[in-house]
Amino acid sequence: MKILFIMRNQAYVRNYESTIKDLANRGHDLKVVFNDYKDNDRLIERLNSEYQQINYSYEKIPDRCDEWSTLVKLIRALKDYLRYLYPEYIKAKKLRKRIEKHLGIIMVACLQGLRWLPKQLGVEPLTGLIEIIEKIIPEDKAIIRFLEQENPDLVLVTPLLDFDSVQTDYLKCANKLGIKCGLCVHSWDNLTSKGVIHVEPDRIFVWNKIQKQEAIDFHRISADKVIVTGAQCYDKWFERNTSTSLESFIERVGLEVGKNYLLYLCSSGFIAPQEFGFVQELLQQMRNAEHPQIRALGLLVRPHPQNAQQWDNIDLSAWNNTVIWPPGGQNPVTEESKANFYDSIYHSVAVVGVNTSAMIESGILGKPVYSILDPRFKDTQAGTLHFHHLVRGGLLQLSHSIEEYIQQLILRLEGKRDQEGEQIRQFIYEFVRPYGLDTPCTPILVKSIEAMADLPSVAVAPLPFWGVCLRVFLLPIALIVKESEYLYRKVEGKINQLFVEPLSRKLS
């Protein structure tokens, strides 16, 4: 098969490295293209040099810029916002504010009345209307031409669920051309923390039964289209072993030899933009603890690669046996960076953090994983749905204060929490490797992708007469919306400057 894999940027290659390699090894031709250019470790270039079947282009793929583009963005942003008015998202304040930025304060103000209406009278009818308009709006001609030129047998996209993602239009155009298309769900939080699926792909590949239910419940996808394959991106950690001894590792990173250490895993900028104050409080209580093992415990702070700049000018030398490593953060994509990541988890006595996917990887290595509920992060801990998967699944042990956490850690160091290991294994089985802890997920995903070749081709039904009439009616509206976007943003900016920002300053 000739496969076109559309990714947001190069950073997304990491989670599909094994998948791309396996597809190439099985004789498929792949071309990886990107919505945006992001200078990074250039993993795709290395894959291209190793496999002649793997090609790529850094040239930005066509965006939707036709007369319908502004209206399309508006209705999709509106539908994305509506999901955050459901009861499941009542605590998701920060997630809701993120999508509100795409709609603008004027539109958000107009929608506030929906909060007080039963969903059958407000959110659901409006969602249905948006879905009708989505079907009425034609495909983008530039994207159609691009797909015709590439002429793939199959289109894969990831992550799709970003707000204002052009990948939706690629699905829409692929459907029009009769090209089968699949969504590869990139991460554990994608189906609940971002936008919704606006155009239904032929297949959606998810990690586990939890994500499958999310696709059905939150995105209205037919169950037979959602395929559970496991988390292929974590296969490499099951196959790996440590590259160095504990003593050598501790000496290399700059901790005190002969003492154990705790690993603090930093989170993304959205989840925890500033963690230094929190880490400082943790250190203070560790160093002042009555228990000698806690006082002596080292702390390795591992910066998140997308939020490492917060540590650039931080000096922890005043705290003994504490390091920030690796400085500047590190994405585990090269052999060296993978070893660094693995070893930092492997040699630690336990892992703690706010809310990050590295907690799952720590569970794969059998490490106890902790999170301290803190008011600074309440909107990105309890205020997200995906955080609760780790708690309910048995991976994450919560505490409501640093003091409570230290007591948990004491029990761990004294060997009184032996039941943790079985809970962690059960979580990894259910969430990461649902076909068995010894069964790699990459071959399952690859075979599921290959099986799409046997799906029957379904022609897109032509618009009925009323649909054609509605399209004619909508076109001038689309043109007006496109022409008035600049004015709308200007007015919104003034309102923000004169009223919203001063009020926010007063409240803070």
Which residues are covered by each model-predicted region?
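Conserved catalytic-core segment of nucleotide-activated headgroup transferases in glycan assembly
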Residues: 234-331
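Catalytic binding pocket for nucleotide-activated donors in carbohydrate/polymer assembly enzymes
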Residues: 198-201, 221-223, 228, 357-434
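Conserved N-terminal ligand/cofactor-binding loop architecture of enzyme catalytic domains
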Residues: 11, 28-144, 148-149, 478-508
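A short, glycine/small-residue-rich beta-strand->loop->alpha-helix junction that serves as a flexible
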Residues: 5-17, 160-163, 270-274
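Active-site-proximal region of nucleotide-activated glycan assembly enzymes
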Residues: 51-54, 130-134, 138, 154, ...
